[in-house]
């Protein structure tokens, strides 16, 4: 209880007439300074900052629009590229097929020419062998009489040429 009394006494000694609910002159001075600073900030600081923020927002909107436009252009270019590549692949495929057909025709033509040449060569060789066989046959038939007479003479020991002419 002694402490409570000393704090009340100390409060009375410090000028007991001041009430914290009633503002004194410093409050109004501080309030006036605050309002002046607030007015200065509102007049000279906020408009340039607002202008910069508005410009930045406009720049961001323009950048976003440019990005969308660029994305559309890229998509269009990609679609055009894909279409061109598909056309080129189709054309290359048709050219390749035409080349295969032409190659097969050339091979077939060369094969036909080669078959004709082989047939001619075989026919020529057959004729040549037939002629050689006929020549050998006539030669052998002409020499058969002489050889048979010689062989008969050797086997019999008698000259057959003179007896065979009768």
Curated annotation (Swiss-Prot):
Which UniProt keyword terms apply here?
Answer: ATP synthesis, Cell membrane, CF(0), Hydrogen ion transport, Ion transport, Membrane, Transmembrane, Transmembrane helix, Transport
Q: Which compartment or compartments is the protein found in?
A: Cell membrane
What is the superkingdom listed in this entry's lineage? Bacteria
Which residue ranges does UniProt annotate as crossing the membrane?
Answer: 27-47
Give the GO cellular component terms, alphabetically.
Answer: plasma membrane; proton-transporting ATP synthase complex
Segments of this protein annotated with the region Disordered:
124-143
Q: One Pfam family of this protein, by short name?
A: ATP-synt_B
Gene3D superfamilies registered for this protein in UniProt: F1F0 ATP synthase subunit B, membrane domain (1.20.5.620)
Matching entries from InterPro entries are given as: ATP_synth_B-like_membr_sf, ATP_synth_b/b'su_bac/chlpt, ATP_synthase_B_chain
Quaternary structure, per UniProt, is: F-type ATPases have 2 components, F(1) - the catalytic core - and F(0) - the membrane proton channel. F(1) has five subunits: alpha(3), beta(3), gamma(1), delta(1), epsilon(1). F(0) has three main subunits: a(1), b(2) and c(10-14). The alpha and beta chains form an alternating ring which encloses part of the gamma chain. F(1) is attached to F(0) by a central stalk formed by the gamma and epsilon chains, while a peripheral stalk is formed by the delta and b chains.
- Provide the family line: Belongs to the ATPase B chain family.
UniProt-recorded name of the protein? ATP synthase subunit b
What organism is this sequence from?
Mycolicibacterium vanbaalenii (strain DSM 7251 / JCM 13017 / BCRC 16820 / KCTC 9966 / NRRL B-24157 / PYR-1)
